[in-house]
Amino acid sequence: MAIRLPLICLLGSFMVVAIAADLTPERYWSTALPNTPIPNSLHNLLTFDFTDEKSTNVQVGKGGVNVNTHKGKTGSGTAVNVGKGGVRVDTGKGKPGGGTHVSVGSGKGHGGGVAVHTGKPGKRTDVGVGKGGVTVHTRHKGRPIYVGVKPGANPFVYNYAAKETQLHDDPNAALFFLEKDLVRGKEMNVRFNAEDGYGGKTAFLPRGEAETVPFGSEKFSETLKRFSVEAGSEEAEMMKKTIEECEARKVSGEEKYCATSLESMVDFSVSKLGKYHVRAVSTEVAKKNAPMQKYKIAAAGVKKLSDDKSVVCHKQKYPFAVFYCHKAMMTTVYAVPLEGENGMRAKAVAVCHKNTSAWNPNHLAFKVLKVKPGTVPVCHFLPETHVVWFSY
């Protein structure tokens, strides 16, 4: 009996692993965190277009209406766009990723809105020029489209050192403030959408797929080949910076982990906070990609959500969703209702760090707020795609 019992336990463990492997990321979340709703910011990243060759059409134009249907077959789909003075019909039949699409708008030539779309198996280029917008989309099988962002450090990494130019050029600078500023009626200039280099289009991979993708400096050249990224390019430098941050030493008192899937993020957070009394929250803004604007703290006032340990996960710049997660003690989490000057509303989440003595003295927060490490609590709003976990 003493021999059989460990064998039964071992078989049981294999069964649990096998069952977990068959779960979708969303189902895995609900199994691991039965009492914790998934935030919209994470739910929106559960779109598995990453390895699809299905047609995706985005049309931005004055008065435009877009209707897209994508059937289950690879490369299939129909898109109908009705805009000001124009009708566009796209059919995605043919070879995977192929097809020719013609759009006709009002007037003649490019000024009236003419777009030609050509696609080859695995690749696609869309160019649309019309009244109210110009769109250029290129697609390569296996990764989202890099739209351009200057490679730079994650300002939420504690050992990060900022350059003087970032005080004026980095929109993340506006996210930092002092805890004493969390009062009703306080005005702040903020922009909540974080730039990830891919126009916010990167999504989670299921863990089984994410684990097949090399992630680390030792196999970086292999990673670039996997995503068809040219070594030395701006995109490659951006990816390299993310990996360097994930591999960098942690500061005193910090526990950190880079999650390459939703499932691995859940596992890390559960290991630090437990599974039954945990919440995960993100900033929610009424309008996506809202510009920098002046907000004031609404009359409803600030609400303290947690005053203990928390796990904060920051979305990184990478071809698929990667989150830099770190557990920190002596942090306070707040819900901050904001009203913009143009009527825009936001349900912001703020994290205040009471002990910053181990942070890099040249961190962006200290330069913006003109304070020294370890002197006062330093706070920051979370961009829309970031999430904080805490016990209650």
Curated annotation (Swiss-Prot):
Extent of Gly residues compositional bias: 94-114
InterPro entries named in the record: BURP, BURP_dom
Pfam families per the UniProt record, alphabetical: BURP (PF03181)
Region span, 5 X approximate repeats: 57-164
GO biological process: response to salt stress
Coiled-coil portions: none
Signal peptide span: 1-22
GO cellular component, as recorded: endosome; Golgi apparatus; trans-Golgi network
Keyword Amino-acid biosynthesis: no
Induction / repression: Up-regulated by dehydration, salt stress and abscisic acid (ABA). Not regulated by cold.
Tissue distribution of the protein: Expressed in seed. Highest expression in leaves and guard cells.
Stretches for region Disordered: 61-136
Swiss-Prot/TrEMBL keywords: Repeat, Signal, Stress response
Effect of a null allele: Enhanced drought tolerance.
Gene Ontology MF terms: mRNA binding
Residue span, BURP domain: 176-392
Swiss-Prot/TrEMBL domain comment: The BURP domain located at the C-terminus has not been identified in non-plant proteins.
Cited function: Acts to suppress chlorophyll degradation under moisture stress.
The name this protein goes by in its record: BURP domain protein RD22
Organism, as annotated: Arabidopsis thaliana
